[in-house]
């Protein structure tokens, strides 16, 4: 390309300086063509004589492919490890790598273009200096021979000059266009570089801001975790305090329940007269309190109006609270004494569970005496019947004596109850046995009755059949003998010849029926699978027998057919002579009533029913 540019510029300069000297144009054009042909010959020679190593697509034989692959893998691993060490802002993406490569190549190309441009400028200056030398001009003009020019030569030269000028103009335009494109591309690349620098600066700013935010977030998180741990510690302390308070409350509630149980126990042990007296006192106190409250409410409403309601509630609350404290202190002492007395007498508590007197006291106390909540709400100080532990011990001894007497009575009642149960069981067993015996006797009687009824029905049927009025005595005897022979044959086939001992017809039939019943019972005991197998075998035998009979029948029919065909073949041929006979109408047939046959059929049916059902 550099050589072409130099030659074109040299030819253009010569044309412009000589102002139309044809010799110089011819020489320059011929020299340009000669140089071009030499260059093409050189290139052809290089192509033919070029070494294989100069081919970029040729790989030498002594190169190891696997070694190259391992080197590439090791290089890729080293690059990855190096990327891991780098920071975030130092790492590059694939697009940034490609853009960096393009920029480096672009800079190298720009430097090469600048060097070539400088060389071309230096050569152009040398050529201008050489052309301006007059000695060279004289030498070139003296040595040329003047030949007469023709019009065709002149036209050819002008044509070649025009073509060269046109080619130069086109090349200048193309060079200008390429320069404009290059400047435009350079401007675009500069703008892209500026944008990239701006984006990089913005990204760096974003990373710095992100680092600052992360540091602030870490600090805030540390503060929040510290506050959270402090709150958790406080919550744990408060929960521990709450649990301790709840445990104390549960303990106090348990003691209060125990005190209430003791108090109820003392009220249950107190006598009924004293409970009635306390109930009357309680009702009187309640009425007095209600009347006093009504009078107080009326007086306060008249004097102070609504403002005195708060002071009244406070005074009432204080009036209720003080006797409650007195009551708790007084009951506490009695409860201690009661617990000590109960511990000294553990068996008395067990005996009291059986005494009806304690149940009676509990009912009376629940119905007549108010509960502790009512007394607390009323604010009344309730008195206790027992003031000393000895009173409780006396009550316990009395209850123990009563319980012992009651226990003795219950034991005696249990003994009598056991004796009654034994006698009842014995009588029940005896009655059950008698009932079972009676049921069996009734069942046997019903069976015998049914048998007798069946035998009576059979005898009646026999009498009705044999005394029908149409059979003679000798006919009945022959019929009975034939029936006896048939029954005997069935008996011999079913029972055998060994057990034959001059039995009657009815006896043989009973033996056959009994054996048939036994066989049916045995058949019910046989598994269903074996029965199905036997049925299948019998069905197979029946089918085989039917098939054989059918084959025999077909064979007989075939033989008969063959005999008829043979007879037809051997018979003489009869020639028909005369007219064909025509069948005439037959007279109507007179129907005869078959009364006798119907009676015989009815008799046969009765005999079948009698002998085979």
Swiss-Prot record:
GO terms for biological process: cilium movement; inner dynein arm assembly. Transmembrane segments: none annotated. One of its GO terms (molecular function) is dynein complex binding. InterPro entries: CFAP_domain-containing, DUF4200. It is found in: Cytoplasm, Cytoskeleton, Cilium axoneme. Keywords: Cell projection, Cilium, Coiled coil, Cytoplasm, Cytoskeleton. Residues 36-55 are annotated as: Disordered. Its main location: cytoplasm. Residues 45-55 have a biased composition (Polar residues). Residues 167-198, 233-260, 396-435, 504-580 form a coiled coil. Pfam families: DUF4200. One of its GO terms (cellular component) is ciliary basal body. May play a role in ciliary/flagellar motility by regulating the assembly and the activity of axonemal inner dynein arm. PANTHER family: CILIA- AND FLAGELLA-ASSOCIATED PROTEIN 100, COILED-COIL DOMAIN-CONTAINING PROTEIN 42 LIKE-2-LIKE-RELATED. Belongs to the CFAP100 family. This is Cilia- and flagella-associated protein 100. It comes from Mus musculus (Mouse). The gene is Cfap100.
């Amino acid at each position: 390309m550099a050589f072409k540019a130099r030659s074109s510029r040299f030819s253009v300069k010569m044309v412009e300086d000589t102002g139309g000297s044809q010799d110089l144009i011819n020489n320059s054009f011929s020299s340009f063509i000669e140089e071009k042909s030499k260059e093409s010959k050189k290139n052809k020679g290089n192509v033919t004589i070029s070494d294989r190593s100069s081919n970029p697509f040729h790989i030498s034989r002594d190169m190891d492919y696997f070694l190259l692959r391992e080197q590439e893998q090791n290089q890729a691993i080293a690059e990855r490890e190096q990327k891991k060490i780098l920071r975030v802002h130092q790492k590059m993406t694939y697009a940034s790598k490609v853009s960096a490569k393009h920029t480096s190549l672009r800079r190298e190309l720009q430097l090469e273009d600048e060097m070539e441009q400088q060389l071309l400028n230096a050569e152009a200056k040398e050529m201008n200096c050489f052309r301006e030398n007059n000695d060279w001009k004289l030498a070139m003009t003296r040595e040329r021979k003047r030949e007469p020019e023709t019009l065709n030569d002149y036209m050819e030269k002008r044509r070649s000059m025009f073509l060269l000028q046109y080619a130069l103009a086109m090349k200048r335009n193309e060079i200008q266009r390429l320069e404009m494109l290059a400047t435009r591309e350079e401007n675009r690349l500069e703008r892209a570089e500026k944008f990239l620098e701006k984006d990089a600066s913005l990204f760096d700013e974003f990373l710095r801001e992100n680092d600052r935010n992360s540091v602030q977030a870490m600090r805030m998180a540390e503060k929040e975790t510290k506050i959270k741990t402090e709150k958790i510690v406080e919550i744990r302390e408060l929960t521990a305090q709450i649990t301790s308070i709840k445990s104390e409350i549960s303990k106090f509630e348990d003691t209060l329940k125990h005190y209430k149980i003791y108090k109820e126990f003392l009220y249950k042990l107190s006598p009924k007269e004293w409970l009635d007296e306390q109930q009357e006192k309680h009702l009187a106190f309640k009425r007095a309190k209600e009347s006093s409250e009504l009078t107080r409410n009326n007086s306060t409403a008249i004097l102070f109006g609504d403002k005195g309601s708060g002071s009244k509630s406070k005074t009432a609350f204080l009036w209720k609270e003080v006797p409650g404290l007195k009551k708790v202190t007084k009951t506490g002492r009695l409860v201690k004494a009661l617990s000590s007395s109960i511990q000294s007498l553990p068996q008395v508590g067990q005996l009291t569970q059986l005494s009806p007197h304690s149940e009676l006291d509990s009912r009376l106390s629940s119905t007549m005496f108010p509960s502790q909540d009512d007394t607390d709400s009323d604010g009344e100080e309730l008195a206790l019947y027992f003031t000393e532990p000895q009173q409780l011990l006396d009550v316990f001894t009395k209850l123990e004596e009563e319980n012992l007497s009651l226990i003795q009575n219950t034991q005696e009642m249990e003994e009598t109850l056991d004796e009654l149960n034994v006698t009842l069981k014995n009588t029940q067993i005896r009655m059950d046995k008698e009932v079972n015996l009676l049921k069996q006797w009734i069942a046997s009687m019903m069976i015998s009755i049914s048998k007798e009824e069946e035998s009576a029905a059979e005898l009646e049927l026999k009498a009705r059949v044999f005394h029908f009025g149409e059979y003679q005595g000798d006919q009945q005897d022959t019929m009975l003998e034939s029936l006896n022979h048939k029954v005997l044959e069935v008996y011999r086939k079913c029972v055998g010849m060994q057990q034959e001992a001059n039995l009657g017809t009815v006896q043989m039939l009973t033996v056959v029926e009994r054996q048939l019943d036994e066989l049916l019972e045995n058949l019910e005991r046989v598994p269903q699978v074996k029965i199905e197998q036997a049925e299948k075998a019998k069905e197979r035998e029946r089918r085989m027998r039917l098939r054989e009979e059918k084959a025999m029948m077909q064979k007989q029919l075939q033989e008969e057919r063959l005999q008829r065909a043979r007879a037809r073949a051997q018979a003489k041929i009869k020639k028909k002579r005369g007219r064909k006979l025509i069948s005439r109408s037959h007279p109507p047939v007179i129907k005869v009533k078959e009364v006798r046959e119907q009676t015989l059929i009815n008799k046969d049916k009765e005999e079948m029913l009698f002998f085979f059902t």
